[in-house]
């Protein structure tokens, strides 16, 4: 059994001061996560976003779309401070694209150019993150020659990958 990754280590070390996420704390029974502690002490800004809105903000950044409207979050604390607009009798919130300086992602396989193939839940956010970041660093289990990934299985093009790091054999997944 592996313990869940607690991203609070980045706040504890001072490497991060803001987090935009759907679930800012690990699924543990610890009394207070480091992210919560940093937020309560004023050392961190926490922006909680519904998961569907979060992935659409990331995808929009990768596609060059600066903003979009969504009905998700209307009438909740998520809507506070955001522009509201009615379309056909329904209220929507304006959400802005979310880009990153760096994306640290994981894939099953990369070819030597950086084309990526994923398995499982890695497909959920990693392809979008690669397109939305200035620099994408990917950790992979295997690096193959160009042509070693079936073209139908390439899920992120090498255009979006800047660095490849191969996981050591036997290294347990986090």
Residue ranges and their predicted role:
Residues 1-174:
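Conserved alpha/beta enzyme-core scaffold
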């Amino acid at each position: 059994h592996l313990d869940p990754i607690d991203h609070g280590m980045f706040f504890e070390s001072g490497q991060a001061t803001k987090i935009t996420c759907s679930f800012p704390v690990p699924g543990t029974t610890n009394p207070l996560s480091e992210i919560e502690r940093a937020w309560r002490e004023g050392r961190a800004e926490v922006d909680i976003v519904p998961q569907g809105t979060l992935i659409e903000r990331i995808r929009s950044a990768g596609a060059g779309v600066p903003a979009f409207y969504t009905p998700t979050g209307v009438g909740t604390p998520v809507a506070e401070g955001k522009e509201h607009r009615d379309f056909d009798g329904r209220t929507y919130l304006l959400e802005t694209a979310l880009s990153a300086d760096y994306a640290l992602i994981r894939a099953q396989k990369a070819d030597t150019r950086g084309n990526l193939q994923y398995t499982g839940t890695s497909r959920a956010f990693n392809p979008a993150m690669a397109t939305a970041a200035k620099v994408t660093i990917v950790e992979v289990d295997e690096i193959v020659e160009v042509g070693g990934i079936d073209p139908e299985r390439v899920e992120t093009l090498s255009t979006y990958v800047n660095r490849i790091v191969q996981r050591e054999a036997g290294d347990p997944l986090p």
